[in-house]
């Protein structure tokens, strides 16, 4: 929740200067770090990595897959563009429906 408060506070302070401030809050993104965590859990639990991803990492997600880094990048590019110049103080979950629960 600290990220949300910081985003809103800085957005209010920076807005008069023409600066927008937003945050992206992704769930599990397919990165080497996450892939390593899945492998570690697979060894610990004695189950295949695919099962770890689905039953452990994505158990609460409505969409059962990891997020592609490009999906996060596309949102970041949009938020940094002139097309998003009226958007500030917002937090964008890219969480496969996790926060919908």
Specify the residue positions occupied by each region the protein language model found.
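Proline-glycine-enriched beta-turn/loop adjacent to the NAD(P) cofactor-binding site
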Residues: 22, 26-27, 31-32, 90, ...
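Short, flexible catalytic-loop segment of classical short-chain dehydrogenase/reductase
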Residues: 26-36, 40, 45
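Conserved cofactor-binding/catalytic machinery of classical short-chain dehydrogenase/reductase
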Residues: 2-5, 30, 67-68
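Conserved catalytic helix of short-chain dehydrogenase/reductases
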Residues: 1-13
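Catalytic Tyr-x(3-8)-Lys segment
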Residues: 40-70
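Short, small/polar-rich loop/turn modules that mediate ligand/substrate recognition or access, typified
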Residues: 15, 20, 87-89
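A short hydrophobic alpha-helix cap/turn motif
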Residues: 14-17, 29, 80
